[in-house]
């Protein structure tokens, strides 16, 4: 009797030079240090993340540099595991724009796995995740689309936690303002 192991990988690895050319075409290469460009390329390559599919982004605002994984990437990896049985995300509460810390807007994700007896439930609160400008007011996205933004945080965190084997080690998603973020 022979045992065969078949490995399936649908990683669409983008060649390093194409990623570098893309950074240049998006005018990001001139904003990033050589070390930041190399870090971005290494992470994209190591995890099979394709910037052309918007699976990974680079964000540079002032001297701050972040590598951001799109929340859809976590969902795709959960689906590919064959263990995802369903999910839903809902919001409750309201926003007090005069005192954001008093807001009780919450997004809750419920994820069902085929190999678990109980659903995974995770909640995040607007007051804890709202991204602010230097003056303390919510940035454009969080001001204009607060429900969408808090749902995206719940989804990214929920799938990352519930499918840690599939998503472990990926850079954490961050919901930042397009005013301060350059997408790749």
Which residue stretches match the model-derived regions?
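Glycine-rich anion-binding surface patch
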Residues: 1-178, 182
């Amino acid at each position: 009797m022979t045992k065969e192991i078949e490995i399936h990988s649908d990683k669409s690895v983008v060649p390093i030079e194409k990623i570098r050319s893309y950074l240049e075409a998006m005018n990001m290469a001139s904003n990033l240090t050589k070390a930041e460009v190399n870090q971005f390329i290494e992470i994209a390559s190591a995890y099979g993340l394709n910037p052309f599919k918007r699976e990974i982004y680079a964000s540079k605002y002032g001297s701050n540099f972040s590598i951001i994984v799109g929340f859809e990437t976590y969902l795709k990896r959960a689906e590919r595991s064959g263990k995802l049985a369903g999910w839903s995300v809902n919001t409750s509460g309201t926003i007090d724009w005069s005192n954001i810390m008093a807001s009780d807007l919450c997004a809750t994700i419920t994820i069902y796995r085929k190999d678990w007896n109980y659903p995974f439930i995770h909640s995040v609160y607007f007051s804890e995740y709202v991204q602010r400008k230097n003056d303390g007011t919510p940035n454009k996205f969080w001001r204009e689309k607060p429900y969408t933004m808090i749902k995206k945080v719940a989804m990214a965190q929920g799938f990352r936690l519930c499918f840690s084997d599939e998503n472990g080690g990926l850079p954490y998603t961050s919901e930042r303002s397009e005013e301060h973020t350059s997408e790749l």
